[in-house]
């Protein structure tokens, strides 16, 4: 900030957008190779380069914000707008899945037996594992709010405790979801019901894994004293994202598990 007369962050040239794009190409190509030729080499390479890119990009952002002071209030305002727009785009992303589900379930075709769930499909009981999953995510929403309030009050110990609980609940949710998939009496290839169920809940599960990773990074940063009560936008973004994941799950539970069964 020494040689500039404005509060904006002029980012230095970075290779990470390019390596991120290339890793995305490798992952999508790798998925096709896995599906059609049962080879995971390209997918593994894509995932590895993606993880390395994320690590190094996050490292640079942490350096610029925490140690170099480039994230001024003006920059933080822009980042807030960016995160809001990102969450709006995610809402529209999931809207497509809900649209596909309701389009198929509200007027089932004769090929489905004229009913929903389609003939031959035995849906999961919404009062068993799905209800437990709902309780787990709602509890994690409470604990991350506790973490946020503790951070605002400067209570580092409680913030770390609450954040650890949130991460543990997120990982528990992922474990429950994996066991549910393993025991489900239908698969993704079982017509429109199987495809809408697994794609919608699967992408939500992916978002839970991403959110848990985001929170783990925040936990490690808080251990190293990176956040203060006035400067903690990285954690704030993670909390927003986690609440979004909570709300999407409530819609999934009511629509697909409860009403759809």
UniProtKB/Swiss-Prot annotation:
Family the UniProt entry places it in: Belongs to the cytochrome c oxidase subunit 3 family.
Mitochondrial intermembrane topology ranges: 35-40, 106-128, 184-190, 257-261
GO MF term list: cytochrome-c oxidase activity
This protein's UniProt keywords: Membrane, Mitochondrion, Mitochondrion inner membrane, Translocase, Transmembrane, Transmembrane helix
Name of protein: Cytochrome c oxidase subunit 3
UniProt function note: Component of the cytochrome c oxidase, the last enzyme in the mitochondrial electron transport chain which drives oxidative phosphorylation. The respiratory chain contains 3 multisubunit complexes succinate dehydrogenase (complex II, CII), ubiquinol-cytochrome c oxidoreductase (cytochrome b-c1 complex, complex III, CIII) and cytochrome c oxidase (complex IV, CIV), that cooperate to transfer electrons derived from NADH and succinate to molecular oxygen, creating an electrochemical gradient over the inner membrane that drives transmembrane transport and the ATP synthase.
A Pfam family reported for this protein in Swiss-Prot or TrEMBL: COX3
Catalysis performed (reactions): 4 Fe(II)-[cytochrome c] + O2 + 8 H(+)(in) = 4 Fe(III)-[cytochrome c] + 2 H2O + 4 H(+)(out)
GO biological process: mitochondrial electron transport, cytochrome c to oxygen; respiratory chain complex IV assembly
Location of this chain's protein in the cell: Mitochondrion inner membrane
Transmembrane segments: 16-34, 41-66, 73-105, 129-152, 156-183, 191-223, 233-256
Membrane topology: Multi-pass membrane protein
Stretches in topological domain Mitochondrial matrix: 1-15, 67-72, 153-155, 224-232
Cited InterPro entries: Cyt_c/ubiquinol_Oxase_su3 (IPR024791), Cyt_c_oxase_su3_dom (IPR033945), Cyt_c_oxidase-like_su3 (IPR000298), Cyt_c_oxidase_su3-like_sf (IPR035973), Cyt_c_oxidase_su3_a-hlx (IPR013833)
Cellular component GO terms, alphabetical: mitochondrial inner membrane; respiratory chain complex IV
Organism annotation: Balaenoptera musculus (Blue whale)
Record has RNA-binding as a keyword: no
Main location, first listed in the record: mitochondrion
Plastid as UniProt keyword: no
Subunit composition and interactions: Component of the cytochrome c oxidase (complex IV, CIV), a multisubunit enzyme composed of 14 subunits. The complex is composed of a catalytic core of 3 subunits MT-CO1, MT-CO2 and MT-CO3, encoded in the mitochondrial DNA, and 11 supernumerary subunits COX4I, COX5A, COX5B, COX6A, COX6B, COX6C, COX7A, COX7B, COX7C, COX8 and NDUFA4, which are encoded in the nuclear genome.
Enzyme Commission number(s): 7.1.1.9
Gene of this entry: MT-CO3
SUPFAM superfamilies xref list: Cytochrome c oxidase subunit III-like (SSF81452)
């Amino acid at each position: 900030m020494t040689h500039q007369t404005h509060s904006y962050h002029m980012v230095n040239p970075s290779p990470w957008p390019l390596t991120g794009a290339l890793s995305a190409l490798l992952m999508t190509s790798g998925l096709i190779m896995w599906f059609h030729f049962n080879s995971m080499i390209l997918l593994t390479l894509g995932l590895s380069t993606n993880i390395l890119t994320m690590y190094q990009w996050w490292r640079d952002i942490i350096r610029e914000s925490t140690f170099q002071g480039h994230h001024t209030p003006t920059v933080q305002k822009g980042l807030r707008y960016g995160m809001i727009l990102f969450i709006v785009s995610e809402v529209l992303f999931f809207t497509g899945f809900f649209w596909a589900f309701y389009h198929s379930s509200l007027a089932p075709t004769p090929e489905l037996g004229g009913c929903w769930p389609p003939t031959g499909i035995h849906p999961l009981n919404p009062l068993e594992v799905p209800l437990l999953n709902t309780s787990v995510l709602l509890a994690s929403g409470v604990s991350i709010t506790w973490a946020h309030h503790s951070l605002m009050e400067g209570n580092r110990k409680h913030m770390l405790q609450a954040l650890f609980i949130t991460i543990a609940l997120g990982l528990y949710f992922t474990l429950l979801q994996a066991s549910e998939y393993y025991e489900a009496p239908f698969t993704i290839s079982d017509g429109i019901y199987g495809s809408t169920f697994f794609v919608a809940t699967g992408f939500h599960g992916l978002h839970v894994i991403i959110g848990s990773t985001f929170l783990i990074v925040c936990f490690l940063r808080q251990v190293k004293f990176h956040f203060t009560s006035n400067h903690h936008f990285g954690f704030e973004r993670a909390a927003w994202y986690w609440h979004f994941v909570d709300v999407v799950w409530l819609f999934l539970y009511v629509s697909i598990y409860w009403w759809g069964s």
